[in-house]
Amino acid sequence: MRKVVAVAFILLTVLAACSSDPRRLLSQAEAKWREGKYEDAIRLNNLVYNRERGGADGAVALLNIGNIYYLNLRRLKDAIDTYNKLVDEYRGSAEEGKARQQLAAIYLNEVGDLTQAISEYDRILELPGVQNRQEIEFLRAKAYFQKGEYNMALQALRHLEEEGVTGHLADQVSLKIGNIYQIQKKYEQALSCFQKVMDSPCIDCRRRAHLHLMETYEALFDFEKAIAAIRSLDASPENQAVISREIARLNERQREVEAGRMPRLPEGRHP
């Protein structure tokens, strides 16, 4: 009888240990998250955090909670508080970098605090072993651009070019540098930036390059090349409507210029 009781006690102990295993709890929390049971997911992640405070699983749990608040429940203050708790308690962890990226996105896209977003990107770049360093540098440059600090943005973007950025990110860097040159009215330099992206495999980048090229030639009053740039857009129903509309507008503008009427050229009409 004593042996039976002892075996039963051992089994109960093992089961209790399994049920409270942090990895198991994190899996259960993830399942609740996928099911849309967000409060249950938060409760389970909090359980892991409270049991594993200071450990790697605790950091994962806090990041999960912050993401649920931010991405699903849209409780931005709770998300910010949770991410800040994570970066305070888990400095140097992989989760700190992820939390700071989310904080930067909230400040940039939700709160409109560009200064704080840039500060978060700076802190990320100070972390050792950042995997997506060039992407973070580009996001920081975009924040400088949105803030109107074009020289800072240009400096950061040129640094990326010097590092030898490639692929889709290279296209984005060239487009953004070209936008800055447009704003600075350095149109010849802007042209070379947009021409680099004309044959990009990215449909959206290619489209933006054609539109910005058209704008730049228009600013130089070279309407023939502006029309050629817009005509060379990829064939699609959406683009065809844009092509027809822009050609009509360019022809009208050319007539106005030739007649001595010089309406102000709108800047940055295409994102």
Model-derived features: positions:
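Acidic, polar-rich low-complexity tracts and alpha-helical solenoid repeat scaffolds
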Residues: 2-7, 14-271
